[in-house]
Amino acid sequence: MHKVELPRAQKLAERAFANLERFLHIEAVSGIVLLIAAVAALIWANSPAADSYEALWHTPLTFGVGSHVYSQSLHFWINDGLMTIFFLVVGMEIRREIHEGALSSLRQATLPMAAAVGGVAVPALLYLSFGHASADQQGWAVPTATDIAFAVGVLALLGKSIPSNVRVFLLALAIIDDIIAVLIIAFFYSGGLDYTGFGVALIGLLMVIGLQKIGVGSAYAYVLPGAIVWLGILLTGAHPTLAGVVLGLMTPVTAMPMRERPLDAITRFTGELLGRAKAPEQDASDLMDPLKRLRLAQRELLPPVVRMQGTLHPWVAFGIMPVFALANAGVSLSGVDLSVEGPQWVMIAVAVALVAGKPLGIVSVSWLMVRLGWCVLPAEINWRSIVLVGLLAGIGFTMSIFIANLAFVDPGSLGAAKLGVLSASLIAAVLGLTWGVWSLRSTASATKAGSPT
C-alpha cells in the first residue's frame, strides 16, 4: 500500500502541537506560570496604572435568560466560578486516592484531617497570643487559611522528584483546611447559612446520582446539574467552589460497564474501520459510524475520574490558575501606616502565625497522632515531607486576604494584615522550596551512599 507523504507544513504543525502538549503537562512549568502571574499582579496593582487593575476586575459580567438576569463582577466569576473547576479536579484526585491510593486506609485518611485541624488551631492561638486590641482580635482566622492553588504551584516547582503522595497529602490537608476556613467565615463572619440553598443543591446532587445510575458517561450531561449544585451552595452563603469538591468526590472511579470488554470492542471497531477504508469505492460517510463507536469504546476504557482529570488538567494549570493569581495577588500596599502600634502587631502576628504556626501545628499534631498509634504515615511520605507540607501550608495568600477583608473594619489594620499575609506567603514559599531542595539532595546522597559500587 502506497504511503501518503504529509505536507511539510502539516508535519511541522503536528510536531509543534505534540511538543506543546508535553510542555503543558509539566507541572513545574505550571508553577512557574502561576508565580509569574502573581508577581505581575503585584506590580500592576502598585504601579501608576493601578486604577486600571481595579477597574478590570470590577467590570460587571451578566448572564441571564429573558427577565432572569444575574450580574456580578469579573472578579466574582473568576473566584467563585472558574475556581470551582479547579476544586473539581482536586476533588477528583482526592476521590482516586481514597479509592485506591494513599488515603484508601482509614488510618491514613485520618492523618491529613488531624494535621489540618492542628494547622488551623495553632496559628489562631498564636495570633491571639500577641494581645491585640479587641477590634484586631477579630483577625484570628486570617492565618488559619491555606491557598491551595499557590501551595500546589510552589510544590510543582520541585518537579517529579517529589513523591506523588506528598502532593496528595498537601491537597487533602489544604482541602480540609479550606473547608474549615469556609465554615469559619459562615459562622463567625456572616449572619449564618441560608438553609434554603441546601434544597437547591440537593436537587442538583440527585440529578447527578440519577444520571450515574442510568449510565450516562458524557461529561456535558452533568453541566446543568453541576451548575444547580453550585447555585445552591452559593445561595447558602458558603463558598460556591465547594460544589467542585463535592462533584469531584462523586465522580466514578471505575469504567462504565459495557456489553463487551472495551479492548475487544476497540479491536472489532478498528478492524471494521480498516475494512471500510480499504474498500475500492470508499465513501467518507461510511467511516463515520465505526469512528463514532471506536471513540465511545476508547472513552469507556478509562474510568471517568481519570478521563476528566486528563482533560481538565491543562486548562486548570495554564488557564484558570494563572488568571486566578492575576485577579487576586494584586494587593495595593499604599496607605499602610506601620508606625501605628496596632497595625504593626497585626502584621507581625499574621506573618508569624502563618510562617511558624502552620508548620508547628501540622507537624506536632501529625507526630502526636502517629506516636499514639492512631495514624500511620502514608507510603513514600516521611517526616521531612510533613515539614515540607507544613511550610507550604503557610502560603495563605488569597484566602487569608479574603478573610482579612471580612475581619477588619479599620483600613490601617486591614492593610497591615494584607502586608503580613503577602510577606508570610513569600517567606513560606521560599522556606518550602529551600527545604524541599535540601530534602531531595539529602535523599539522593543517602541513596547514592547506600548503593553498591
Curated annotation (Swiss-Prot):
Location(s), subcellular: Cell inner membrane
Pfam families xrefs: Na_H_antiport_1 (PF06965)
Principal subcellular localization: membrane
Membrane topology of the entry: Multi-pass membrane protein
GO terms of molecular function: sodium:proton antiporter activity
One GO CC term on file: plasma membrane
Signal sequence extent: none
UniProtKB keywords: Antiport, Cell inner membrane, Cell membrane, Ion transport, Membrane, Sodium, Sodium transport, Transmembrane, Transmembrane helix, Transport
GO BP of this protein: regulation of pH
Catalytic reactions of this protein: Na(+)(in) + 2 H(+)(out) = Na(+)(out) + 2 H(+)(in)
Similarity field: Belongs to the NhaA Na(+)/H(+) (TC 2.A.33) antiporter family.
Function: Na(+)/H(+) antiporter that extrudes sodium in exchange for external protons.
Full protein name: Na(+)/H(+) antiporter NhaA 2
Species of provenance: Pseudomonas putida (strain ATCC 700007 / DSM 6899 / JCM 31910 / BCRC 17059 / LMG 24140 / F1)
Classification of source organism: Bacteria, Pseudomonadati, Pseudomonadota, Gammaproteobacteria, Pseudomonadales
